């Protein structure tokens, strides 16, 4: 079924920054998609086009990207008369029209907005739910509900505290369903609020960009201690494990790492990658840490590789791999990590996101689908994670509507699947393993 109209506009994301929203019309109706945006971005990500006009939104406007859709991409697609069910053809056409390696002509935010809307329209055209359409595009007969990784303590570039490491997450792997995982996550979150309030006072329970708490602590193991206490208090020590996103590229300084990077610079406190690796090993030993994302800088390949060989937990590449096929292939070859963080806006199209996921999975990696810190009410990634059967998703704390939008959609999907619903649980790293 052909597209009848494509219209883009500038809307605001959860941080009050502009982003792109696309409305695509077919005979079946109107399909709307909005594009997310990250705070700690990898240098190898596809280009997010911003206007740079300091008199509007401090330079962060996206009118250029919107205009590229309304004046160029949209009309070209309508003229081409491609069907919305041909996701790959549509994406390929836009990528070739852009003609750059990193989508810098039109902006990944322009191409992705259209790509997401086309995917939603394609599902409607086939008369199937979005998650089923995505599963078909990926060649998956199965559907899997993911374990949610709730980011409940925020540090790094997401928070105004001194904590260097960006995210401390809880994963309710012992739950029997996604709905139960939500309940467990929410209960631990509320207990954590009480623990933080009791220890640091009420103002320490203010939340960061992703709904997690941002108490003013400096020591990273103090955050882990808070999680451990909250998990015990909620009564789930056997059901909840811990994940971290260190986002180490944010505090990499001249070949070393600064765990107090928000204070005035002092090179004498910088530590080597090897020393940082030892710190992670102590975390794994003393706490139920099962997953660490971006433990080292995006170009510190050597440290990634030596660290991976010495641990048996999940090591996730985000800034390292940026959902990019070339970077993933490089990481596979160097044995740098064993899990891909999948962010649709890092690569900028649905087709390439599916390809990245399949490349990672075919090499025995896990895949974790992820939001960005600047989000919208769009729930596309909830359907994406089910269709791609990755078994794990991180989309913030059980707090803030732009985060809950995704989690609530996952509960609806589980409900719709009824007794066919499969929850990844403890098999979150490889949910397809029989």
From Swiss-Prot:
- Quaternary structure and partners: Mammalian enolase is composed of 3 isozyme subunits, alpha, beta and gamma, which can form homodimers or heterodimers which are cell-type and development-specific. Interacts with PNKD.
Annotated Gene Ontology cellular component terms: phosphopyruvate hydratase complex
Q: Kindly tell me the pathway this chain contributes to.
A: Carbohydrate degradation; glycolysis; pyruvate from D-glyceraldehyde 3-phosphate: step 4/5
Chief localization class? cytoplasm
Q: What class of enzyme is it?
A: lyase
Q: Name one GO molecular function term.
A: phosphopyruvate hydratase activity
Please name the gene that encodes this protein.
ENO3
* Compartment(s) of residence: Cytoplasm
Q: EC number(s) per UniProt?
A: 4.2.1.11
Residues annotated with Phosphoserine modification:
83, 157, 176, 263
Species this chain originates from: Sus scrofa
What's the domain of life for this entry?
Eukaryota
Annotated InterPro entries? Enolase (IPR000941), Enolase-like_C_sf (IPR036849), Enolase-like_N (IPR029017), Enolase_C (IPR020810), Enolase_CS (IPR020809), Enolase_N (IPR020811)
Q: Which HAMAP family match?
A: Enolase
Q: N-acetylalanine occurs at which residues? A: 2
- Name of the molecule in the record: Beta-enolase
Q: What protein family does this chain belong to? A: Belongs to the enolase family.
Cofactor dependence? Mg(2+)
Q: Where does substrate bind?
A: 158, 167, 293, 318, 370-373, 394
Protein purpose: Glycolytic enzyme that catalyzes the conversion of 2-phosphoglycerate to phosphoenolpyruvate. Appears to have a function in striated muscle development and regeneration.
Keywords annotated in UniProt: Acetylation, Cytoplasm, Glycolysis, Lyase, Magnesium, Metal-binding, Phosphoprotein
Q: Name one Pfam family in it.
A: Enolase_C
The entry marks the following residues as binding Mg(2+), namely: 245, 293, 318
A Gene Ontology annotation in the biological process aspect, one of them, is: glycolytic process
